[in-house]
């Protein structure tokens, strides 16, 4: 499944990861998390409590499936949709991608268009499915690098605006603005300002959450998905 844009990544580079997920038992009707390393690292492999254990139904039942592929772009989320999403027939889809796309040369608009195409396919195959589109996640990398940070932040904010606008126009979509949640800041007044995020909730690379970061992120997700848990 391809987009209308020039493909800027090797679409088969994550074949091993995809095959590994395909070996697992298919559980239909779950909330499927489909995205890049924000989800991949939410696992014991990275010394974090797994997503499936932290996002549970209100009755304690298992409701989530984690299909994170570290390094993936929206182009690859679309390409692998027939294998990684469609067979599971999820009742809800939580989607995250952007940083890797920007690094590969995709514009905020192109990333939004790729996500929209993925959602269009899901609507056809799974009528009534709900979508949750995560805004660009917080980070501390580049914060102290002046113009590089300004360029990075502008792209993130532009993509967030596109996500918010798309969700406003589609009743089956909910926009989840991570950067606006006070959970990730020292004071509520700092919420919404990427540059004021707490630095102690990330691992050394300044991009990925540590366990405390994932504890907060899990709370954010549970609150955001409360009506379907």
Where are the language model's segments positioned?
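Histidine-centered active-site loop/cap adjacent to the catalytic His
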Residues: 77, 198-229
């Amino acid at each position: 499944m391809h987009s209308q844009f020039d493909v800027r990544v090797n679409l088969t580079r994550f074949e091993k990861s995809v095959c590994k997920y395909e070996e697992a038992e298919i559980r239909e009707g779950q909330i499927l998390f489909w995205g890049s390393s924000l989800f991949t690292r939410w696992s014991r492999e990275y010394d974090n409590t797994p997503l499936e254990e932290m996002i549970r139904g209100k009755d304690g039942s298992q409701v989530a499936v984690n299909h994170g592929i570290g390094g993936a772009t929206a182009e690859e989320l679309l390409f692998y949709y027939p294998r990684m999403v469609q067979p599971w027939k999820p009742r809800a889809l939580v989607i995250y991608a952007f940083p890797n796309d920007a690094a590969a040369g995709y514009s905020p608009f192109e990333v939004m268009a790729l996500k929209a195409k993925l959602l269009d396919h899901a609507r056809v195959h799974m009528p009534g499915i709900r979508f949750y589109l995560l805004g660009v996640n917080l980070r501390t990398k580049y914060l102290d690098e002046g113009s590089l940070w300004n360029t990075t932040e502008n792209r993130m904010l532009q993509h967030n605006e596109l996500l918010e606008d798309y969700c406003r126009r589609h009743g089956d979509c909910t926009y989840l603005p991570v950067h606006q949640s006070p959970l990730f800041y020292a004071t509520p007044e700092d919420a919404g300002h990427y540059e004021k995020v707490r630095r102690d909730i990330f691992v050394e690379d300044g991009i990925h959450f540590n366990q405390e970061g994932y504890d907060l992120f899990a709370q954010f997700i549970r609150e955001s998905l409360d009506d379907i848990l």
